[in-house]
Amino acid sequence: MPLFAIGLNHDSAPVAVRESLAFNAEALGDALQSARSETGADEVAILSTCNRTEIYIRLPHTDPEVVIGWLTRHQRVDLRKVRPHLYVRRSTEAMRHLMRVSAGLDSLVLGEPQILGQVKDAYHKAANAGCLGAVLERLFQHAFAVAKQVRTDTDIGSNPISVAFAAVTMAKQIFDDFPKRTAVLVGAGETIELVARHLGQQGIGQVLVANRNVERAKRLAEAHDGEAMSLNDLPRRLPEADVVVSSTGSSLPILGKGTVERAVRARRHKPMFMLDLAVPRDIEPEAGEMDDVYLYTVDDLRGVVAENMRSRQDAATQAEAIVEQQVRHYLEWRRARDAGEAIRSFRSRAESYARATRAQAARQLSRGEDPFEVIEWLTHTLTRRLVHAPTVGLRAAAATGDRTRIQHALETLAIDQQLVERSSEGDDSQQAGADGGAARGDRRAAGGS
């Protein structure tokens, strides 16, 4: 059964598309059962985070469109909307993908550790739903081993290197008394969540989260001991902000120059650090013309992030090598497992032949037939039955000139190649002798006539 990894992530799809395919954690068990029954899958696991939705699945066929069709139907999403953002990884690429994801090599933030916990959650949910078999079980264990080795043997997670971290670092350069400061975060997506996390780690005094969807703002605020509000409340609460970080998907500015100007006056011209991470921009660029406003965009942070990325390229290269090593180990296990299944099947067939032939021999003996002749019949019949299938395969390979297949068969059956060649030469000599004798006989017959 082929293995697939099917889904989308932060590189292939915007937040709006990712949200449409995200699975509710409480309903994931039912979704797993549905995926298994409707696609005919042998095994299935679903990884759903704010950055990605991925289905790892073993199918009895090679058509991933069945899974894509199930996914869009189950999530009630228009296939045309999400199809351009989906990727399909097959076999070895699917194995490699899960290992890279688990190690943080496919994350928005290179090497971020949170993804490993999310992969483990996906594994446990699939196991609890009875949707894991030997193949996915072993694959997840190899993925966990990769993540652990990458953490232990490389510096991939030594320092956070994200736009969010760079933003907070820059804010701290302006305010050295962070515990006394208030941050207003506009938006509630992954980037803002990372900003909130780093602000908390740096000891920010208070966090206010403004978002069009207040429920999402509440969830984010509660996770960081903050306060939520709607975008309509933002102008009224903006004067409280020492730090403003905005990242929404709005096509128009959220904060105009006039709103910022009124907030600065209400603050009695105390400095305000503003970072606009959105594209298109959330904050009118004219707001940065005021003396007390320090307005930056994501482009102003790229240098910091790129420098940190360069400093960790060696670690990333080491991590990729670890992934490749584990992919090889997993493939070795898969091949050994597949061979084991073939061996068990072959032995089962041989034992079935033996039982049937033995039963026939017993009936012959019960009829009083000569035991020696029965033994001769038994050995001849059993040998013929056991070698029939390999013989048919060898003849088919010989007929097509497939020498590689013949060589593999000889090695598998432990047949000496030199013995085969000597036997072939002997057959040729015998045939030549027979041809010569026939020719002499023809001459004798001609002379005697």
Curated annotation (Swiss-Prot):
Residues 440-449 have a biased composition (Basic and acidic residues). It catalyses: (S)-4-amino-5-oxopentanoate + tRNA(Glu) + NADP(+) = L-glutamyl-tRNA(Glu) + NADPH + H(+). It is an enzyme of class 1 (oxidoreductase). Residues 418-449 are annotated as: Disordered. Coiled coil: none annotated. GO terms for biological process: protoporphyrinogen IX biosynthetic process from glutamate. NADP(+) binds at residues 187-192. InterPro entries: 4pyrrol_synth_GluRdtase, 4pyrrol_synth_GluRdtase_dimer, 4pyrrol_synth_GluRdtase_N, GluRdtase_CS, GluRdtase_dimer_dom_sf, GluRdtase_N_sf, NAD(P)-bd_dom_sf, Shikm_DH/Glu-tRNA_Rdtase. Its EC number is 1.2.1.70. It comes from the Bacteria. SUPFAM superfamilies: Glutamyl tRNA-reductase catalytic, N-terminal domain, Glutamyl tRNA-reductase dimerization domain, NAD(P)-binding Rossmann-fold domains. Keywords: NADP, Oxidoreductase, Porphyrin biosynthesis. Substrate binds at residues 49-52, 107, 112-114, 118. During catalysis, the active site Cys acts as a nucleophile attacking the alpha-carbonyl group of tRNA-bound glutamate with the formation of a thioester intermediate between enzyme and glutamate, and the concomitant release of tRNA(Glu). The thioester intermediate is finally reduced by direct hydride transfer from NADPH, to form the product GSA. Belongs to the glutamyl-tRNA reductase family. Catalyzes the NADPH-dependent reduction of glutamyl-tRNA(Glu) to glutamate 1-semialdehyde (GSA). PANTHER family: GLUTAMYL-TRNA REDUCTASE. Homodimer. This is Glutamyl-tRNA reductase. It comes from Halorhodospira halophila (strain DSM 244 / SL1).
